[in-house]
Swiss-Prot record:
Keywords: Ribonucleoprotein, Ribosomal protein, RNA-binding, rRNA-binding. One of its GO terms (biological process) is ribosomal large subunit assembly. This is Large ribosomal subunit protein bL20. Pfam families: Ribosomal_L20 (PF00453). Belongs to the bacterial ribosomal protein bL20 family. Binds directly to 23S ribosomal RNA and is necessary for the in vitro assembly process of the 50S ribosomal subunit. It is not involved in the protein synthesizing functions of that subunit. It comes from Myxococcus xanthus (strain DK1622).
C-alpha cells in the first residue's frame, strides 16, 4: 500500500507556521516565506546569545571604570590590584556593587589600591 506523508508534512509545516506567529505579511501564513524567516530568526537568536554575553561584559567594565575613577583608580589598575590582593570578585559583582553599594565598592577599591 502506498504511504503518503500528509500528516507528517502538515505537522512539520504547522510547527514552522506556529514559530512564525506574529510576523508581518506573507511571512506569517505562507510556508516557504515563513520557513525562511524562522530560519533567519533562529540564526540571529544563536548569534545574539553569544553577543549578549559580550555586551554585558562591556557594560560591567564601563560601570566599574566609572566607579573606580571616583576613588582615583583606573579600571586596569583596579583589576590588577584585586588580583594582587587575591580578591576573587568578578566583573558582574563589582558592577552591581558599584551601583548598589558605592561605599562597599570604595572599600574594595582602597584594598586594591594598597596592594
Amino acid at each position: 500500500m502506498r504511504v503518503k506523508k500528509g500528516v507528517k508534512a502538515r505537522r512539520r509545516r504547522n510547527r514552522i507556521l506556529k514559530l512564525a506567529k506574529g510576523y508581518r505579511g506573507r511571512r506569517k501564513n505562507c510556508y516557504k516565506r515563513a520557513n525562511e524567516a524562522v530560519e533567519r530568526a533562529l540564526d540571529y537568536a544563536s548569534r545574539d546569545r553569544m553577543q549578549r554575553k559580550r555586551d554585558f561584559r562591556r557594560l560591567w567594565i564601563v560601570r566599574i571604570n566609572a566607579a573606580a575613577r571616583t576613588v582615583g583608580l583606573s579600571y586596569s589598575k583596579l583589576i590588577a590590584g584585586l588580583a594582587k590582593a587575591k580578591i576573587g570578585l568578578d566583573r558582574k559583582v563589582l558592577s552591581d556593587m558599584a551601583i548598589a553599594d558605592p561605599s562597599g565598592f570604595a572599600a574594595v577599591a582602597n584594598i586594591a589600591k594598597a596592594a
